[in-house]
Amino acid sequence: QAALFGWLPVMLWILIGGVFFGAVQDFASMYASVKNPDGTNLFPQNYDAAKWKTAADAAYKIIDGNLYQLYHSDDDDPYDNYYGITQEKWNSELIWTTGSKGRFIMSAHTCPTSVAGSSSWGFVGVTQQQVDAYPMAKTGRFPITGYESDGSPIVDQESGYPMDEMAYTDFVYPAWGGAASYKLNTVKMCTERDPRFYVTVFFSGSKWHHGNEMTLTSFAHGANGYTSDARPKSGFLVNRFYDHTANSANGQWGEITFPTFRLGEIYLNFIEAVLECKIRGVNIPANYYTKAMEVWQELRAR
């Protein structure tokens, strides 16, 4: 506990210097008039680029302390490396959690109605924009760079993303979370994506893994809650926070130590702050940029 609370001021400086406060000029009209009860402004009234260095310093202090390590699964599998962050309780990456809690609420809301049991509600989904944000596995490039006025995607031609994204194709769904790989026929949009996509996003036509069972699920043509509220409007559910090793059909939901702050986030905060300093001409220690690129490679390799 002493080690944990010793780092709390550092986390606050990251927030103060980072996007939410350091870049408050982007939301000036929204926040400028927000005040404390004593009349003092709650948010900065003027932009200060030097706060990016404050954020970089705070993040570097955590990184340099070597108290935490990025989580890796026993076999260093890229899918389980990501899934394990929320699956393995009290793992080496967690800095501050909400403690060990039951997963029922978050899991019941994301478990599709195709799964047996009275608590498979399946209506908390992922937006299409979030789906589009995941890079391609082979190139590492982000496929969708924006949208036309009619909502159609602007595709990075070098990403490897299929132009016929809604055409169906055979695909081998990857093995992760204790479940074996399997073949399915799905839209090309959902194929050959970054491992984080499959751990996070559940899409129609794939199988929901729960305990020793794999349940085929579709959100189209009246299947699995299409005519009720118990379905995701976007056609995608959230995979990640459900314990796929537990049998929720029998009321087993598992527990989670929810990662309020984890080392991966600190790495990203540090990288962002260092790059903002570089762009805005803010002086930082000579080793910061090298360290930022080093931890970026660690994240990508993981």
How should each PLM-predicted stretch be described?
Residues 1, 21, 49-63, 289, ...:
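Hydrophobic core segments within long, regular secondary-structure runs in both alpha-
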Residues 2-12, 16:
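N-terminal low-complexity segments that are often proline-rich with Ser/Thr-Pro
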Residues 3, 22-30, 269-279:
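Well-ordered alpha-helical scaffold segments within catalytic/enzyme domains
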Residues 6, 66-74, 275-282:
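Surface-exposed helix-capping loop/turn segments at secondary-structure junctions
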Residues 13-24, 260, 267, 274:
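TPR repeat positional signature
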Residues 24-221:
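An aromatic- and glycine-enriched ligand-binding surface/loop that stacks and positions planar moieties
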Residues 177-299:
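C-terminal substrate/ligand-recognition segments
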